[in-house]
Amino acid sequence: MRKDFDRYGLIEVCIGEVLRQLKDWISLYKVSSRTLGKHSNEKQKIVSENRILTPDEMRGLLKLYPGQFSNTFIDQAIERGDICVGAFVKGRLAAFLFCSLSTAPDKRGLWVRVKKPYRYGYKSYTNPEYRGLRIRLAYVSDTFFLDREFTHAVSYIERHNLASLKRQHRRGQHTSVGYVIVITLFGQTFFHHTPGVKKIGFELYQHETEDQVLPT
C-alpha cells in the first residue's frame, strides 16, 4: 500500500480503494479519446506487417486461440462490420485487435455504442513471445480507419484502475472526455453519462442477452 501511495498519491489510492470495494453496486469509468495518427514515439522492436483480417481469417482465430472466442462472437462481429487488424511477423499472426464502428460487447453484460468519427477497440491479444516488443496495434492501425474517415479512437477505464490510468496519462496522447457512472441496485442497472461523453456519441448500456460478452 505504501508503494501505491508513493506511485499514485494518497487521494487517488483512497478513491480507488473505495470504488473497488463498491464495484458490485457502483462503477465509475473515465472516457478518453485520441486523435488517430497521434501516438507514442516509441518504435516497435520488431518488424511486422499489419493488415485487416478477412472474414475467413477472423473465423480462423477460433482454431488459433481456442477458448478465446465463441462462434457467435466472431459471426456477429463480422455481421456488425467490425474490423480486426492483425500484426504478422514472418507470415505468422503475432497480435490482433478488434475494433467496432458501431456497437461492441464488453464484460459484465455491458455494451459500448460509438458513432462516426469515433472507433472503439474492444478485444486485443499479443502472443506471449511477442510481448514487450511494442506491437501497438491500437496505434499502427490508425491508417486503416483514417482511410474510412474515422478521426478518433475512444476508450474507457475503470476509475479504480490506477495503473492503466497512469500509463495512459504518461503516453500523453489521450484527452479526457468525461465519465460514465453505472449503478446496480435490486437487480436494476442505471447509467449516467456526463455531457462530454454524450456529445461524442459514446454510450455504455446493458444488452438484453449476454451471449457475446467478452470472456473474463
Where do the model's predicted regions map?
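Short beta-strand micro-motifs in enzyme catalytic cores
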Residues: W25-S32, I83-V85, P117, I181
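Conserved GNAT acetyl-CoA-binding A-motif
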Residues: D147-E158
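A conserved beta-strand-loop-helix scaffold within acyl/acetyltransferase catalytic domains
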Residues: K63-P128
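Conserved acetyl-CoA-binding loop-helix of GNAT-fold acetyltransferases
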Residues: K123-L146, K166, R170
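Acyl-donor-binding surface of acyltransferase catalytic domains
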Residues: M1-L53, L64, N71-F73
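Conserved active-site alpha-helix within GNAT-family acetyltransferase domains
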Residues: R159-Y179
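Charge-rich, low-complexity intrinsically disordered segments
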Residues: Y179, G187-Q188, T194-T216
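Conserved catalytic-core motifs of GNAT/GCN5-like acyltransferases
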Residues: S27, H174-T189
